Amino acid sequence: MIDYRGWRHTFKLDPDKTIDDEALEAICESGTDAIIVGGTYGVTYDNTLELMSRLRRYAVPAVLEISSLDAVVPGFDSYLIPLVLNAGDPDWIFAPHVSGLQAFGAYIHWDEIITEGYIIANPEAGVAQLTKARPIADATQAKAYAQVATNICRLPIVYMEYSGTYGDPTIVKAAKTGAGEAHLFYGGGIRNPEQAAEMAAIADTVVVGNVIYDDLDAALATVKAVKGTQY
């Protein structure tokens, strides 16, 4: 199994977005700890396979965060399986996982599977709309959701997902407290090294995504910012 507990920084690439070879090389050779592949809309088998085949040129670990059963591609180093803890649509908590096991259970290498408890904190995000995510009312509730993930569901990762907007450090700190021994990922809205460093002081792993496609230099600068931050 991939040792995600050593990750401080990861980039997240969306198969439905375009990235040229030069930019991809810069991302993969940046010193980031891993590349996560995943997205909410437009993720297909073909575009996931195409991105995976390009990533295989590099030594950096590549993991697939599964959001669609139609886009499960073999060949990644590991697979992240999200459970959306605050999904308002209960079908997004366990129903996709049951369907996935019915379809692929005989082929799964369980040592390649890592489960995540997602807390979606941006109600305007596409993933929030898709799952009808319940808003996070305050820090106390964020902590409680994280406690559900680690103490009730026994999930190894808690993922605070702000998806496109920069998060409230108070909320993220509360989730970190609630996560206990679980590993806290933070993702959402990081546009510069300063924001990356602020979240790196709280979370175990900082995930940088959209800025890759808007400002590559700023994205690359987040690696040093995160890895130079104590937490």
Swiss-Prot record:
Enumerate the cofactors the protein uses.
Answer: Mg(2+)
Query: What positions does the entry give for sn-glycerol 1-phosphate binding?
Result: 12, 159-164, 189, 209-210
In its UniProt entry, what is this protein called?
Answer: Heptaprenylglyceryl phosphate synthase
Coiled coil, from the record: none
What keywords were assigned to this record?
Lipid biosynthesis, Lipid metabolism, Magnesium, Metal-binding, Phospholipid biosynthesis, Phospholipid metabolism, Transferase
Q: PANTHER family given for it?
A: HEPTAPRENYLGLYCERYL PHOSPHATE SYNTHASE, PTHR40029
Source organism, top-level taxon: Bacteria
For this UniProt entry, the molecular function terms from Gene Ontology, in alphabetical order, are: heptaprenylglyceryl phosphate synthase activity; magnesium ion binding
Record field: catalytic activity: sn-glycerol 1-phosphate + all-trans-heptaprenyl diphosphate = 3-heptaprenyl-sn-glycero-1-phosphate + diphosphate
Organism source for this protein?
Brevibacillus brevis (strain 47 / JCM 6285 / NBRC 100599)
What Enzyme Commission number(s) apply to this enzyme? 2.5.1.n9
Q: In which pathway does it act?
A: Membrane lipid metabolism; glycerophospholipid metabolism
Q: What is the lineage of its organism?
A: Bacteria, Bacillati, Bacillota, Bacilli, Bacillales
GO BP annotations, alphabetical order: glycerophospholipid biosynthetic process
Please name the Pfam families in this protein's record.
Answer: PcrB (PF01884)
Binding site residues for Mg(2+): 14, 40
* InterPro entries given in the database record: GGGP/HepGP_synthase_I, GGGP/HepGP_synthase_sf, GGGP_HepGP_synthase
